[in-house]
A protein has these predicted regions:
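Sequence/structural signature of beta-propeller modules
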Residues: 31-160, 554-556
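Repeated scaffold domains used in trafficking and secretory/extracellular systems
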Residues: 93-103, 139-150, 168-183, 223-233, ...
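Residue-level detector of Asp-centered blade-edge/turn motifs that repeat once per structural unit
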Residues: 104-107, 184-186, 234-237, 294-297, ...
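Structural motif
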Residues: 116-123, 127, 195-205, 246-253, ...
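Asp-box/WD-like beta-propeller blade repeats and closely related beta-sheet repeat scaffolds
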Residues: 154-178, 195-197, 203-236, 258-289
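Long, internal scaffold/assembly segments composed of regular secondary structure
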Residues: 293-404
Length: 556
């Protein structure tokens, strides 16, 4: 076992006095009013007063990136969903996030979404597109286009389908991760990353939900900030936080007038690693390839290739100095490509406070790190690479002989429960390159030859400070969906496949029993690596293959 390495940041930041920030956060949160995330007796993080006052103002739900809610989701008996229970908009591929606004003066809300080609604003109640801002001049994507694409994914031999799927994937997703993670602030500004900066969009007419979309402001990296934007978040005192794939952390004022940046520890590894990934044509596999989590005390958490790291913001300085509370801890990385998960924070009351990822081993392990002080006399789990590791459990989906399992999804955190899914294709075509398996679980995820099976819950016991497997369900399929948990309905939700149909699956959070299946339909309802979530009305929303989808299973 290695002791936690001591980082040596450029510039040598001094100690951080965070008491003022904590007090300010409490005051601002009180003034902002209770958000859904504020309830739950310490199970959920405090609402960030600088995000839109809604159930989903940022990817992964909130600044803590937990992918869970106290709001009750669907609990009706399983049944095939009728047309009246399904709403969708044909916006075109690539609209992964669906970000909910605060209420406008008249009580209306809108949903913001984006692709590499456009920014859209939709009516919250109907999903009707209210306004569009074109980034690229492209023909409108139609239902006929959607039908043609869906048919092509089913036609011909396996080789024909694989070739078509590979080509389609290149047109559907951005070349990098810059525009994947977005957020909406309390003033209605929708922030989208670009390769070397960030752009804010908003209403051209203030207070009008049907207003055209205006580009409010753009900011490009100065010469001393390197890399492309990967993750985005916002501190509890209102500073935008960005991570770059070169290993830099950035805080930026919301008017783009002030900026702070720091190199993360071990970022000297990034250039060679990124060059190797580029040479192997592995787009999206850079040294940092997931978004970032932020806590209410100024902690900023990012997972790099083989390293889990914390930077600290105190309102005027950004630091990676251990004396300020920052740290960097190694995690196991046998694949050599790091974690596929965005860090998720766990523990918000007076109990244990942890940050959770899956590691980079071929058989991934859910790995939890102490966010703040490592308890005196702490003995980490056997095999841990740092004293900061609090818990580490391999994900086997109930098969003790399993040797490989990876997921590209964040760990769902609900209280001290953690839910993960299997994203390994059931089989691989002969000669198919393993690094291209995303094609199998995305565009071809409804083919039973490739559909992955398995959902697993782990639980942290704050009394014994141990992590254990709580249950495994091997019936559940979740080819590419980012799952979601509702403590209000005691369910974990995902979108999988049953009998060729994309299907909403509801699993009891306490027991792992598959409580209900709601078949939806064909390729249009493929989640395509988007996250699902529960809105305040208890409906499921996600980004489908051809546009946003909303589900409201009713009692038959």
């Amino acid at each position: 076992m290695k002791n936690e390495p001591k980082s040596k940041p450029p510039g040598g930041q001094g100690p951080v006095a965070i008491a003022v920030l904590i007090a300010l956060t409490a005051l601002l949160t009180a003034c902002a009013g209770l958000r859904p995330a504020d309830s739950g007796g310490g199970l959920f993080p405090p609402g960030n007063p600088f995000l839109a006052d809604s159930a989903y103002p940022i990817g992964h739900t909130n600044s803590a990136q937990v992918d869970s809610t106290p709001v009750a989701g669907p609990s009706a008996a399983g049944h095939r969903l009728a047309e009246t229970e399904v709403a969708f908009a044909t916006t075109g591929p690539g609209h992964l996030a669906n970000i909910i606004s605060s209420k406008y003066p008249g009580g209306k809300r809108v949903i913001w979404t984006n692709s590499p080609h456009d920014i859209l604003k939709m009516d919250y109640d109907t999903l009707k597109v209210l306004a569009a801002y074109e980034i690229e001049d492209r023909p409108a994507f139609t239902d006929a286009d959607a039908d043609k694409m869906a048919a092509s994914l089913k036609a011909g031999s396996v080789i024909d389908r694989l070739k078509y799927a590979g080509g389609a994937a290149r047109t559907m997703f951005p070349a990098d991760l810059a525009s994947v993670y977005t957020m909406l602030d309390r003033d209605g500004r929708y922030y989208v990353g670009s390769a070397h900066g960030i752009t804010a969009y908003g209403d051209a007419i203030a207070g009008d939900p049907a207003s055209p979309i205006a580009l409010k402001q753009s900011w490009s990296f100065p010469a001393d900030i390197k890399g492309a934007v990967v993750g985005i978040n916002i501190t509890y005192d209102g500073w935008i936080v960005l991570a770059t794939d070169a290993g830099m952390m950035v805080t930026l004022s919301r008017d783009f007038s002030q900026v702070h940046s720091v190199w993360l520890p071990h970022s000297d590894e990034a250039p060679a690693y990124n060059a190797r990934m580029a040479a192997e044509h592995r787009s999206g596999y850079n040294w940092i390839r997931n978004s970032i989590a932020v806590d209410a005390e100024g902690g900023i958490y990012v997972a790099a290739n083989g390293w889990m790291e914390k930077a600290v913001w105190n309102g005027h300085d950004l630091s990676v100095d251990p004396t300020a509370g920052a740290w960097a801890a190694p995690y196991a990385n046998g694949t050599g490509t790091g974690t596929g998960s965005t860090p998720a924070l766990m523990g918000f009351g007076h109990g244990d406070r942890l940050v959770v990822i899956t590691d980079g081993e071929p058989l991934m392990r859910v790995t939890a790190f102490w966010r703040n002080q490592v308890p005196a006399g702490w003995t980490p789990p056997q095999g841990a690479l740092s004293d900061r590791v609090a818990g580490m459990v391999p994900v086997t989906m109930g098969d003790p002989q399993r040797r490989a399992l990876q997921s590209e999804q964040a760990v769902v955190v609900a209280g001290y429960d953690m839910v993960v899914v299997n994203n390994e294709p059931a089989t691989m075509p002969p000669g198919f390159p393993p690094r291209a398996k995303a094609v199998l679980i995305s565009l071809l995820g409804d083919d039973p030859a490739y559909t992955p099976h398995g959902m697993e819950k782990l639980a942290w016991n704050p009394a014994t400070h141990k992590m254990d497997v709580a249950w495994v369900n091997t019936e559940v399929t979740s080819p590419n969906c980012v799952p979601y948990a509702s403590i209000g309905s005691n369910m974990a939700y995902t979108v999988g496949v049953k009998n060729g149909d994309w299907t909403l699956e509801a699993v009891r959070l306490d027991t792992g029993v598959l409580a209900a299946e709601y078949p939806i339909g064909g390729a249009r309802f493929n989640t395509m690596f988007s996250g699902i979530y529960v809105d305040p009305e208890g409906r499921i929303i996600y980004g489908g293959m051809f546009g946003p989808v909303r589900l409201k299973p009713a009692s038959p």
